[in-house]
Amino acid sequence: MTAPLPNRHTRTAIIDRTRVIIDYRTGSTTVLTGTALARWLDALEQSAAPAPVAVQASAISWGTSESAACLPLLPRPPWRWALAAGVLLLCTLGVRQFGSRGTRFGRLVRLAEAGRNLPPPPREQAALAVRSVRWVARFLPARVACLEESTAASLLLACRGRGGAWRHGIATDPIRLHAWICDIHARPVEEPDQTDDYTPLNTPAATAKRHR
C-alpha cells in the first residue's frame, strides 16, 4: 500500500528502524522501511504533520494475551446515563454506517474528539461513561468494538462538560491499534493492564507539536 503524503491527518509512529504511518482520515496503516522511509522523512521535513511519536516496546507476548472466557457482569448504570449512552451509541453507529466507507475511520475520529477542548473528566465520571456504553452495547445487535465504544463514551462525557479523554494508540509484538478513554491523569479507564502497552498517538502534546 502506498502511504499518503505527510499532512495534518497522518501520524508517524517510530518502532525500531521502521515507521508506521496511520492516516486518520481513512484508517489506513502503512509500514515503511528503506527507501520508502527515507522519502517519507524527507517529505515530513516540509510538512505540517505532527512530529513522529516514539513507541514504547511492549512486553514480549509472542502475539498472544490472556482474556476472560466470558463477558463480565455489568451493573445497570443510572437510567439517565444509560439512556444517554444508548442515544449516543446509536449516533456513533449511524455515523459509521452512513457515508463513504473509505472515510469511516475519519468520521469516528472527528466525533470522538468533538469535546477535546473541554476539561478532562475525573476517573469516576470517565468510568461511569465507559460502563454505561458497554452496558447498552450488549442489547444492540451490532458490532461495537473499541473505536465505537470509546467514541460513544467520549460523546457522553462531552455532554457532561468533559472532554479530551479519547485516546488512540499503537503497540508492538505484533503491531496493533487500540482506542480507549483516559481520566484526568491520562490513565486508561476500565481497561485491562495490557492497555499500558499502547503508546497514544493523539495526545494534545503529540498533535500540537509539528515536525518542523
Give the label of every model feature segment.
Residues 107-137, 160-163, 167-184:
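Small beta-barrel nucleic-acid-binding modules, principally OB-folds
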Residues 30-51, 120, 132, 193-212:
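A signal for specific C-terminal beta-sheet/loop modules enriched in small/flexible residues
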Residues 1-116, 135-142, 159:
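N-terminal accessory/pre-domain segments preceding catalytic cores
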Residues 22, 149-212:
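Hydrophobic/aromatic-rich core segments of domains that either
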Residues 4-6, 50-52, 72-78, 119-122, ...:
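Proline-rich intrinsically disordered, low-complexity coils
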